[in-house]
């Protein structure tokens, strides 16, 4: 190895993120609850557009990757270069339905935002083999379907459609020459405080278990097939599932790096971040660090920290190995 190679600075990897509120670091409009007190009280000390008291999954992922914080699509979507990657995720986004003027573009629309930037010649040269693309999906389509009291018999077809759309979007990202393409598994929806409240936060609602299990089973098959196709065609692309389902369950069973007194109960209860006639429509705990969940759906900063401590070496290897 020549001296010039030894002196050459390491190429800093970039992170490109697509998804929903589990990944959004500030793309939603200022009238959403993520921009209202008490969101952001732990970090940065004020609302920042994150659906949390502080740092979220995207922030911890970039630390593991050794990347700088990605630009927000909301503020940098028209920039000529993406030297720090970009976060296209919007809180409230789903996989399937999104009207043309929706403030919450669905995940396919988000991926197409990047495609448009590439076609405009503003990104292509900025994507390198060390860069990572991530699709973060927390089941917005399923939660909406369940909350609308739609027939349970239709869930199987919905899951199949959602997972197939995830597959298509991963293929599109592969076509943009990403070598590392990650997707999250689906967290245990029935263990979210919005559903555990029915049991006074004592147990998960098992009625959602079947759809979560089916989603993750189909996703594993899709990712395995994509990796096999990549191997056969010698594309040197690696598709990877960030298994937050297992991490959620591990932490909630008190086997993670942080023990929470009641991991099914949220710190901010009620309509977090909302008020009426000057009065708060929520109650807030004294110490968010002692809670796994921040609100009815989203983990606290400490919750996300525990999740990423469980994810450990397999995730680090995928993100950092050439």
Swiss-Prot record:
Gene Ontology biological-process annotations: lipid catabolic process
Molecular-function GO term, any one: hydrolase activity, acting on ester bonds
Lipid metabolism keyword on record: yes
InterPro entries per record: GDSL (IPR001087), SGNH_hydro_sf (IPR036514), SGNH_plant_lipase-like (IPR035669)
Annotated keywords: Hydrolase, Lipid degradation, Lipid metabolism
Superkingdom of the organism of origin: Eukaryota
Pfam families with a match to the protein in the record: Lipase_GDSL
Annotated Gene3D superfamilies: SGNH hydrolase
SUPFAM superfamilies noted in UniProt: SGNH hydrolase
EC number, UniProt record: 3.1.1.-
Enzyme active site: 21 (nucleophile), 295, 298
UniProt-recorded name of the protein: GDSL esterase/lipase At5g03600
